[in-house]
C-alpha cells in the first residue's frame, strides 16, 4: 500500500506488506 507507506512512514507497512 503506497498510501500507507507515505502515511505511516514505511515502518509499519514493512510488517504489514512485508516490504
Curated annotation (Swiss-Prot):
Query: What InterPro entries does this protein's entry cite?
Result: HMD_N
- Main EC class the enzyme belongs to: oxidoreductase
TM spans (from-to): none
Pathway(s) the chain acts in: One-carbon metabolism; methanogenesis from CO(2); 5,10-methylene-5,6,7,8-tetrahydromethanopterin from 5,10-methenyl-5,6,7,8-tetrahydromethanopterin (hydrogen route): step 1/1
UniProt keywords, alphabetically: Methanogenesis, One-carbon metabolism, Oxidoreductase
* Record's catalysed reaction(s): 5,10-methenyl-5,6,7,8-tetrahydromethanopterin + H2 = 5,10-methylenetetrahydromethanopterin + H(+)
Q: How is its activity regulated?
A: Very sensitive to O(2).
Enzyme Commission code: 1.12.98.2
User: Tell me, what does this protein do in biology?
Assistant: Catalyzes the reversible reduction of methenyl-H(4)MPT(+) to methylene-H(4)MPT.
Whom does it interact with, and what assembly results? Homotetramer.
Instruction: State the family named in the UniProt similarity comment for this chain.
Output: Belongs to the HMD family.
Protein name, please?
5,10-methenyltetrahydromethanopterin hydrogenase
Q: Give the organism, scientific name.
A: Methanothermobacter wolfeii
Supply the gene name. Answer: hmd
Amino acid at each position: 500500500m503506497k498510501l500507507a507507506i507515505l502515511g505511516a512512514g514505511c515502518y509499519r507497512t514493512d510488517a504489514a506488506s512485508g516490504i
